[in-house]
Amino acid sequence: MRLDAWDSVKQAWRLDFMDDLRVLLREKFGHQSLRSGQAEVIRPLMAGRPVLAVFPTGGGKSLCYQLPALALEGLTLVISPLIALMKDQVESLTRRGIAAARLDSTMDAEGLRALYEDLDAGRLRMLYIAPERLANERFRERV
């Protein structure tokens, strides 16, 4: 197999970001290595390509989007139909010092105000929302 100069640059970039991801994996999530299949999901995400990943319950799906969310710039929207799962994920991330929040129907006015303040200030890395939230035009314009 022949690599031209551009392929070498791309390969070096891939290795660099995988090294950075390993550091984040250890420091933020306390894992020494990725599980089987996770790197194959994360690589295209880091390159801006869409991915469909199907893993069993407990197979490490969340880490496949959480790790790139920390490595890449901006806000990552996580669409989840289950409020209980959103709460668990956000609590776990905030315990790790990761700026995450959820936006769901159980929130009171004060919680919504604080969330939108954080969102507008760019303080959030991950925002968990229900699928129907995407139907709200004001929300889509805001994010």
What are these regions (language model features)?
Residues G59, M107-V143:
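Conserved helix/coil segment N-terminal to the catalytic DExD/H
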Residues L75-R96, M107, G111, A130-R133:
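Conserved Walker A/P-loop ATP-binding site and its immediately adjacent core
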Residues R102-D104:
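Residue-level recognition of beta-strand->loop/alpha-helix junctions
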Residues P50, G74-L77, R123-L127:
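Loop/turn-to-beta-strand initiation segments
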Residues A69-A71, L93-R95, E117-G122:
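Conserved catalytic network of the ASCE P-loop NTPase/AAA+ motor domain
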Residues R14-P56:
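Conserved pre-motif I regulatory segment
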Residues G48-L67, V78-I79:
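Walker A/P-loop
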